[in-house]
Design a protein with these regions (language model features):
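A short acidic, Gly/Pro-enriched loop at the edge of an enzyme's catalytic core
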Residues: 115-124
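Conserved SAM-binding strand-loop segment of SAM-dependent methyltransferases
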Residues: 101-114
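Conserved Class I S-adenosyl-L-methionine-dependent methyltransferase catalytic core
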Residues: 1-50
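A short glycine-rich, Lys/Arg-flanked "PGG" loop and its adjoining helix->strand segment in the class I
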Residues: 139-151
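Conserved beta-strand signature within the Rossmann-like core of class I S-adenosyl-L-methionine
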Residues: 152-160
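Substrate-binding/catalytic lobe of Class I Rossmann-like enzymes that use SAM or dcSAM, i.e.
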Residues: 160-271, 278-279
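Conserved SAM-binding loop of SAM-dependent methyltransferases across substrates and taxa
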Residues: 66-77
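Conserved class I S-adenosyl-L-methionine
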Residues: 55-63
Length: 279
């Protein structure tokens, strides 16, 4: 299981380089000197604004990670949230966190594949999960989104992508870090979205945000080098540092970006302008 391969490393490792909410995805830097925690909280707020969630709506978070987005949605809006993951470590953590925050009646976490769901949702969000879907399954993924999304609903897909034409993933990343992972070109996403019957209502390209995020992660790893080596070994530390430094370079000097796709079924699901996102 490709997701579990990466995310079921000991949680103690992630605590050594991620922000306190364990957000393992690109932050949103309003200023390049923002702290990692500030940027990650900015990201959550930005996504919640784009989803434009109303009270009592049903929200699905596909690939919910350690639950930060699902829990923050529940804390800020009186709605019903479902978070799903394929990682047992993440699932256990999410359930425990929901209990600690007394949000069990509002947030449900499930250890399940999104393809097994047969419910309707008003809002569907996926952060950093699309990279694991695989090119040959893009059509199936977006068709499933279309089937689960209410006619007046809004979906937001946040994914790493490339500004270059389609190409095979880097073999080192595939072998050592993300087996089965792939970062798509824009052209590879739009076609299956259209075929699924969805409308691209908004696209935002986050350019240097991930390079700033990765810089913070790399610096945190270096700061905690002794603990990481004790947890694993010197070889693992060098591999992890190389992974973070290489990805930082790809986002700063290469062709990697983050795309945020807002998808709907009709033109009236979102406001006429983007002002609501920044109010």
């Amino acid at each position: 299981m490709n997701v579990a391969h990466h995310y079921d490393l000991t949680d103690d490792l992630y605590d050594l380089f991620l922000d306190p909410k364990r957000q393992y995805s690109c932050g949103y830097f309003k200023n390049k000197n923002d702290s990692l925690e500030t940027a990650q909280n900015n990201k959550i707020k930005h996504i919640i604004k784009k989803l434009n969630i109303k009270p009592n709506q049903k929200v699905l978070d596909i690939g919910c990670g350690w639950g930060s987005l699902a829990l923050d949605i529940a804390k800020s809006i009186n709605c019903e949230v479902t978070g799903i993951t394929l990682s047992e470590n993440q699932f256990d953590y999410c359930v425990k966190k929901a209990k600690e925050l007394n949000l069990e009646n509002q947030v449900t976490f499930k250890l399940i594949d999104y393809r097994e769901l047969n419910e309707k949702f008003d809002r569907i969000v996926s952060i950093g999960m699309f990279e694991h879907v695989g090119r040959k399954f893009y059509q199936n993924f977006f068709k499933k989104i279309e089937q689960m999304l209410d006619y007046e609903g809004i979906s937001l897909i946040h994914t790493i992508g490339s500004v270059s034409p389609p190409r095979d993933p880097h073999p080192w990343i595939t072998r050592y870090i993300f087996p089965g992972g792939y970062t798509p070109s824009l052209s590879e996403v739009i076609k299956p979205v259209e075929k699924a019957g969805l409308i691209v209502s908004d696209i935002e390209v986050l350019k240097l945000h991930y390079s700033h995020t990765l810089r913070h992660w790399k610096e945190n790893c270096i700061k905690n080098k002794v603990e990481i080596i004790e947890m694993f070994d010197e070889k693992f530390f060098r591999m992890w540092e190389f992974y973070l430094a290489g990805c930082e370079t790809a986002f700063k000097w290469g062709d990697q970006v983050v795309y945020q796709f807002q998808l709907t079924k009709n033109y009236t699901s979102t406001p006429a302008t983007r002002d609501y996102i920044y109010q």
